[in-house]
Amino acid sequence: VTSYTLSDVVPLKDVVPEWVRIGFSATPGAEYAAHEVLSWSFHSELSGTSSKQ
């Protein structure tokens, strides 16, 4: 069994709207394969506030 790790930091604030849903998809082509997400993390920060007066 071969194991692979994928890790990346992606600044999404400039490319996605305020509310999003995240999903995973993978395929080896025409053959069957099982994929497992062994860990997942997500971090979000509020970078500022606005108030209307």
Swiss-Prot record:
Family annotation (InterPro entries): ConA-like_dom_sf, Lectin_LegA_CS, Legume_lectin_dom
Highest taxon of the lineage: Eukaryota
Record-linked SUPFAM superfamilies: Concanavalin A-like lectins/glucanases (SSF49899)
Protein name as it appears in the record: Mannose/glucose-specific lectin alpha chain
Keywords carried by this UniProt record: Lectin, Mannose-binding
UniProt-listed Pfam families: Lectin_legB
Molecular function as annotated in GO: D-mannose binding
Assembly mode: Heterodimer of an alpha and a beta chain.
Similarity field: Belongs to the leguminous lectin family.
UniProt function note: This lectin specifically binds mannose and glucose.
Gene3D superfamilies, sorted: 2.60.120.200
